[in-house]
Amino acid sequence: EYDANDETGKYVNRAISTEKAPGSTFKMVVASAALDTGEITPSTRINDSGIYPYGDGQACWYYRSYGVGHGYLNLTQAIKYSCNYFFYDLGYRMGIDTISKYASYYGLGKRTGIELIGETDGIVASREYANSIGYNTWYPADTLSAAIGQSFNQFTPIQMARYISMVANGGKNVDVSIIKSIVNPDGTEVSKEEIESFVKDTVGTENELTEDLDISEENLDAIRRGMKGVTSEPGGTAYSTFADFDIDIAGKTGSAQTGVEGEADGWFVGFAPFDEPEIAVVVLVEKAGSGGYTADVARAIMEEYFGMNSEEITEDKSAESSIESVR
């Protein structure tokens, strides 16, 4: 939260330093784990009957809102509708160790190595982390919470961008960089290895994700089709924002509870175009209340990127006096 009296907080680069629970945007991690380990297949159906029978009385958001569950859903549908019950069940079946392992496979909880000072690690919910802070008993309810992106899970927006890029590109590790190239005065290009060494020595960070995620295209396709349903099919949690969009988008909304009623952090993650991705977008709005607001921001970003924004920004001289008064 911005505070004009905080002389340090205003300079925080939130993209690389702010760690927030990802909420339902974490569900593609759990989906990847369940499919890749054979716990389910893309056609497996789970019956969301409302309140999950194990854990601590957790229920799907749909049940909380309408008094009934989603009914039988497969994975693609569960992502589209953001069905918590479905992912509670996957979490209960697999356990926290498998979930945390696949989160790490996607680079969550690991620095990207971007050439900026201040990047933080993030936190993957795990027994190891819990033990490190004196939380020595891991309960089933903790796993259910972690499976929908809560519990101890906290990641930076830049980590989330790498994660979504890997979902889009088939699981390939992504070099996160603000440098396209560096050219010496003699016209020769500085090698990637030299740049990485310099960044490590001066900024003190490096890409901590060293391997690709080996997951089948069939399994990733089931996940990505669910993300497409989020934006392009009635009932999708971002359908109202993208229903008339001219380009097919894959997306996922998320609302991460903060402990204060009505002040959930809102997320949107996505990529476009769906068939041949060019851009991954991550939007975080603190205390937004839900992930719906973030989809509007993501749409504006994509409109600008794809040249769909016909409005030109012009200088407004009339605004200068009012701006000066609040500096």
Model-identified regions with their sequence ranges:
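Beta-lactam-recognizing serine transpeptidase/beta-lactamase-like catalytic domain environment
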Residues: 1-23, 29-283, 323-327
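Short amphipathic alpha-helical signal-transduction/dimerization elements
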Residues: 168, 299-310
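Intrinsically disordered, low-complexity acidic/polar segments
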Residues: 278, 290-292, 308
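Gram-negative outer-membrane assembly/targeting C-terminal domains
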Residues: 306-327
